Structure formats: C-alpha cells, structure tokens
C-alpha cells in the first residue's frame, strides 16, 4: 500500500507561526505567518489540493511586524489573530490584534502560479487586544466551538479574557487574572479546553502547567515541575475531558489526567532536542503529533490512553455469526508506538497542526520557512477505521 509523498512549500522568509483555518470544514487550508526584521511580513494562505497533491497559495501583507503566533476564528473563515513584535523607540513590544482577510480569499480563490506579478493584498485591522500595561503577548486562543466572540490573550504574567463586539471591531476586556509567585513569571503558551462547556483554559509558565476557570478567573489545578525545563506547548484531548498533553525543553512529551496531577499518565522521550509543539488529532485522539528543534516530526499512536484503548470494538449484537466474532479486534489494550518519524525538515520545527477538514492530513513548519504537508500512513488509517 503506497503512501503519498509529502508535499513541500517554501516561504522566502523565516517562519514559526502556523494554524489551520479552523472554521473551514470542506477545504484543506493552513495559514502561515513569517518572521522578517528587514521586509514586510506576510501571511501565506496555503490551499492543499488533495486530488492532485499540489499547493495553491495567496499572500497577505502583515506590515505590523514579525509574527510569533497565529490563530484562526472557529466561526468566521475570514478572521484571525496574530501576536507580533513591533519596535518603537528602539524598544521591542509584543502586541496582539484581530484581522480580517479580503472576502475573496476566505474560500481560497488563489493566484495563478503563472502570474508572478500578482500583488499581495493587505489585512484589514479589526481591533487591537490592547492590554496597556499588562506586558508582552505570547499567544491568543479562541473559545473552541464558539461564535468567535471570546478570546483569551496571555501577556507576561496576565491572562486576559476578551469579548469581541459585533463584527469584531472592538475588544472589551471582560475579566483577567495574574500569576502570583516569586520572580518574573511569564506565560509561554495556553489552550482552551473544548470540554466543561468551554469554561477551562490551561496555561504554561516556566516549568508549570495551570488550569483556570474562565467564569471566576481562578486557578483550578496546578502541575508544578511538569517538565524539567521550560514548557513550550500543550493541547487537550478532544475526546477525554480530563486529559492533556504537554511538551518542553527537556525533550519530553507528557500526558496528564488533571484529576490527579502528581505524576503524568505517560511520558514520551522520542525527540533529542526541545519539543516545541504537540497536537492531538481532532477525531482520533490516539494520534499525537510533535515537532522539535531536532528537525523531526513524530506521529505517535497513544492508543492505551485514548478514548478507544481496545481499538474499534464491535458490539455482540452487531455480529450475525458468533463463529466470526473471534476475528474481531481483541479486547486486550493495544500497544502505544511511534507510527512514523518525518525528516523532511532541515531546521527547527516550531509548529505542527492537523487540517481542520481532513483528519488524516497534517502540516509542519520549520524556521527556514519550509512547510511540509503529510498524511497518516494508509495502513494505520484503515486499521483505525475498519
């Protein structure tokens, strides 16, 4: 069973920000933000044509500054948020803003490759997530499955919940909380849980993971020394409400049950350098992607701690011939394993993410501007489905 070759797209600038176009459920589309100090920065809208195995792209100018983080609205295909650096008075400040792309680009009408003269279009600024004295913004996360009207920004030691007004033209600060403790505590990343009616957010700061209740903005759990060094990223299991994954500079990926945070449920040690990004598959939560500055992307099968630890079970009632029943998948838990290691990158892989429209396809981005689109191996796909 021949697997499709990876598809590689090169940006002319360095890049570390990647997101799927979350509200798009039909087309496979990713957004990539660049990091250039000398030239105007860009957002590349990457359309993947699955049938022909080719990439089409559009380029939007992001003149506000180099992009450190990008996230897409879960409700509106044309709306996105960026965290970017701007320099004023020889001082660098990390800001955040919400933008709208031109209407005709929301659904991927793309420039023809034969037309090099086609000019990049600009983004429309909807609003700044202006936190005043709160500090440098590390990331912006949208309320999952929401109407695109609630976002959280993490700025230095502050977690800020914003209500976006109609048409997102203004952001109103609804509530906030601050990290308390010794030293200069700073958030590095965060994720909004799709469970518990979307009332929980998890954050990483230094080596600690924390859970927050968005209604009271109070801390609900704390995992100190979750990693031996800085925590870089985290993600929630989409199917198991108390499970989350984290990764960090100790080269490890850890899986946690937030009801018992004394030790991780599982630890992976497959990378040889800092792990920058971890993502659960949106549909099949045993599939976990990680990207690292060892320049590798690893796809792991964490089936023992997934929502289907015994595989896809068939009810006795569904089997017409009892004699055939012994051929069904065994009721022993399946073994966790590394499915594949992808080595198309030659630089640090800062971001990995699954396509929102196809559960078997994912993208990875390395600092040299190389975006690689890969698929879950066919044999595993059919093993999961059948």
UniProtKB/Swiss-Prot annotation:
InterPro entries: EIPR1 (IPR040323), WD40/YVTN_repeat-like_dom_sf (IPR015943), WD40_repeat_CS (IPR019775), WD40_repeat_dom_sf (IPR036322), WD40_rpt (IPR001680)
Biological process (GO), any one: positive regulation of endocytic recycling
Residues where N-acetylmethionine is found: 1
Composition-biased stretches (Basic and acidic residues): 322-332
Tissue expression per record: Ubiquitous. Highly expressed in brain, adipose tissue, spleen and kidney (at protein level).
Keywords for the protein's UniProt record, in alphabetical order: Acetylation, Golgi apparatus, Phosphoprotein, Repeat, WD repeat
Positions annotated as WD repeat: 132-172, 182-222, 226-266, 270-310, 344-384
Name of protein: EARP and GARP complex-interacting protein 1
């Amino acid at each position: 069973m021949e697997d499709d070759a990876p598809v590689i797209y090169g940006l002319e600038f360095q890049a570390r920000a990647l997101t799927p176009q979350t509200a798009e459920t039909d087309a496979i589309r990713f957004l990539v933000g660049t990091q250039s100090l000398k030239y105007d920065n860009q957002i590349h809208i990457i359309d993947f044509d699955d049938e022909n195995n080719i990439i089409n792209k559009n380029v939007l100018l992001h003149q506000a500054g180099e992009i450190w983080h990008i996230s897409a609205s879960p409700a509106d295909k044309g709306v996105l948020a960026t965290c970017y650096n701007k320099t004023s008075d020889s001082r660098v400040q990390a800001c955040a803003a919400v933008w709208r792309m031109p209407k005709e680009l929301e659904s991927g009408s793309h420039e023809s490759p034969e037309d090099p003269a086609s000019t990049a279009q600009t983004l429309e600024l909807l609003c700044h997530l202006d936190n005043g004295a709160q500090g440098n913004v590390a990331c912006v996360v949208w309320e999952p499955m929401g109407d695109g009207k609630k976002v959280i920004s993490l700025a230095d030691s502050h977690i800020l919940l914003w209500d976006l007004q109609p048409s997102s033209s203004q952001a109103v600060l609804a509530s906030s909380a601050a990290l308390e403790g010794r030293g200069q505590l700073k958030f590095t990343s965060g994720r909004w849980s799709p469970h518990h009616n979307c009332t929980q957010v998890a954050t990483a700061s230094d080596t600690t993971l924390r859970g927050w209740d968005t209604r009271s903005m109070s801390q609900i759990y704390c995992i100190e020394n979750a990693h031996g060094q800085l925590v870089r990223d985290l993600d929630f299991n989409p199917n198991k409400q108390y499970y989350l994954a984290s990764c960090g500079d100790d080269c490890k990926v850890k899986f946690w049950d937030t009801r018992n945070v004394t030790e991780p449920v599982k630890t992976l040690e497959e990378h040889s350098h800092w792990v920058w990004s971890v993502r659960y598959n949106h549909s099949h939560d045993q599939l976990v992607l990680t990207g690292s500055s060892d320049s590798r992307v690893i796809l792991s099968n964490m089936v023992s701690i997934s929502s289907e630890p015994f595989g896809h079970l068939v009810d006795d009632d569904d089997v017409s011939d009892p004699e055939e029943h012994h051929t069904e998948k065994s009721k022993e838990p399946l073994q966790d394993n590394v499915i594949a290691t992808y080595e198309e990158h030659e630089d640090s892989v800062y971001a990995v993410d699954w396509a929102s429209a196809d559960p078997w396809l994912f993208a990875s981005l390395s600092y040299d501007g190389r975006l690689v689109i890969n698929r879950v191996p066919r044999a595993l796909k059919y093993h999961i489905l059948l």
